[in-house]
Amino acid sequence: MCSDPNVYKNKYMENSNLNIQTILQSARSGAAIYDSSDWGKILVSDRDRLRFLHNQSTADFEKRLAGEGCDTVFVTSTARTIDLATGLILDDEVLLLCSPNRREYLFNWLDRYIFFADRVKLKDVTDTLASFTLMGDESAGILAQLGCPITDLPQHSHQVYIIDGVEVRIAIGTELGLPGYRLICDRDKSATLHQSITNLGAAIVDEDAWECLRIAQGRPKPDAELTEDYNPLEVGLWDTISFAKGCYIGQETIARLNTYRGVKQYLWGVKLAGSVAVGATITVDGEKVGVLTSCSQIDGGILGLGYVRSKAGGVGLKVMVGDVEGEIINIPFVRHEYPV
């Protein structure tokens, strides 16, 4: 028996990291499933639902038809980020999928903007609906084996299928930008659905592995990359923004930043030579150029996310993060090119 608790701790961490690497590989080139049931789910209904969401977020909801969907960013009146969400357009409702730590905040924020003449209703259905993310290159094959052959459909398009007696809404795409699908069903049927998928070999993604994937892909998270310190253009969420739809909350600031090429900092990945605390200052030649917002051990190294001043440089820039050497790298989920 080992008398030194640190030896046991280090051995446990090695085994844990090895397991996470196996899960990460499955999520990319194989198949893996993540239980996202605690992510917020808000039903927006009644006559003005599309116009309401159109006016409250960055995406063009009024052009969307039932069976379609889109990512959108909810921002403050000064275009500071609240959350990155997905809207699935149903026949008579819109199902908003939002971050777990923004569920209550976003519901109350939306409710505050429903005025007397608006025909809009909100309902939090997080506790009645389960959701899963099935990801990886082999995820389509698993769904095909379950009787759901899905091919060549647009991102976020969705429809209802039956899997082992369970009614499941399957949407194209994942929260991470990896190949895969989001699956939504009644909570009381979720165990059956989960078992059907894992029986076909999908690895289970736990919260630690999910956080590693999130950082590696560069998906921003509320209270880390999405805060009132940053706007959607700094985050790199250009594809969630309609520049042609007219007024919405925060639109004036976003339009001005785009028109005058005024984005002063960008979210990047940071490849680190060692561990460093979140919140550490990013410097170049002793001058502060940014801040580290997330960090984890991934793919045998340390990766982080952080904001860096645009004038300092981008991919390939050598930096110090605290007292640790680092290099700015690209992250797949975001982009930083102004539209043509």
Identify what each model region corresponds to.
Residues 2-82, 88-89:
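Acidic, proline/glycine-enriched N-terminal capping motif
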Residues 4-8, 78-80, 230, 235-241, ...:
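Glycine-rich, small/acidic residue-mixed loop/short-helix segments
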Residues 32-34, 41, 86-220:
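Acidic, low-complexity central loop/insert segments
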Residues 74, 149-162, 275-287:
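Short amphipathic alpha-helix segments
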Residues 182-268:
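Anionic-ligand-binding alpha/beta catalytic cores of soluble enzymes and soluble regulatory domains
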